Amino acid sequence: MKKILSTLLMLGMSSLTFANSQQVVEQLQKMGLSGVEVSDSPVKGIKTAVTDNGIFYITEDAKYILDGKLYALSEKGLRDVSSSLLLDKLTAYKNEMVVYPAKDEKHVITVFMDTSCHYCKVLHKQIKEYNDLGITVRYLAFPRGGVQSKTAREMEAIFTAQDPQFALTEAINGNPPKTLKDANITKKHYQLGLQFGVNGTPSIVTEKGELIGGYLKPADLLSELAQ
């Protein structure tokens, strides 16, 4: 990512003279960005480029590119506009998630997690408390060591197990699966996490697509979601 961004900044996009979205896509692909989808942003004069490498913002004259989050200001504070663009992709993976549903559901969160992560374990061991507060918890895999790591292969076995809920809880309690699998589902989850800007676990995505980095106690998370 840093190498790609450095290339973009050095070029400054000043040499680009494209006038439509397809030309934007082609130029960004030449610079090493993949899966590029260009659309209008909420900001006049700025285009949004959703890529496998993250989200970028490009001025319509194609002279500047911005890397980072875009927030909308409101009376309630800041709203993460960038992550909300990825909600459709998140929904596409709903059948690959390990889900712990709340009986009286009020909120749904999606957690990018790593079974070797201390605070992911803390969060999971409180799963009943989250559920009792009306919070449904959905997990996606985000092995911090990358998709070639042992943890990635363990998580692949968990997410494809006959009973993923049981397999995940067992792993959290120190009993990981004995048979490992090459990352497939895990790889897709990891890539989506990168698009959301996940750089650590647990990372929580709200129903609005906003990213909350780090662990929050059940009551604190409920307060955050109610805002």
Curated annotation (Swiss-Prot):
Secretion signal, residue range per the UniProt entry: 1-19
Cross-referenced Pfam families: DsbC_N, Thioredoxin_2
One Gene Ontology CC term in the entry: periplasmic space
Top-level division of the source organism's lineage: Bacteria
Chief location category: periplasm
Localization, UniProt: Periplasm
Disulfide-bond pairs as recorded: 117-120
Protein keywords: Disulfide bond, Periplasm, Redox-active center, Signal
UniProt xrefs under Gene3D superfamilies: Disulphide bond isomerase, DsbC/G, N-terminal (3.10.450.70), Glutaredoxin (3.40.30.10)
Free-text function comment from the UniProt entry: Required for disulfide bond formation in some periplasmic proteins. Acts by transferring its disulfide bond to other proteins and is reduced in the process. DsbC is reoxidized by a yet uncharacterized protein. Also acts as a disulfide isomerase.
Family assignment from sequence similarity: Belongs to the thioredoxin family. DsbC subfamily.
Subunit-level organization: Homodimer.
Protein name, as recorded: Thiol:disulfide interchange protein DsbC
Native species: Pasteurella multocida (strain Pm70)
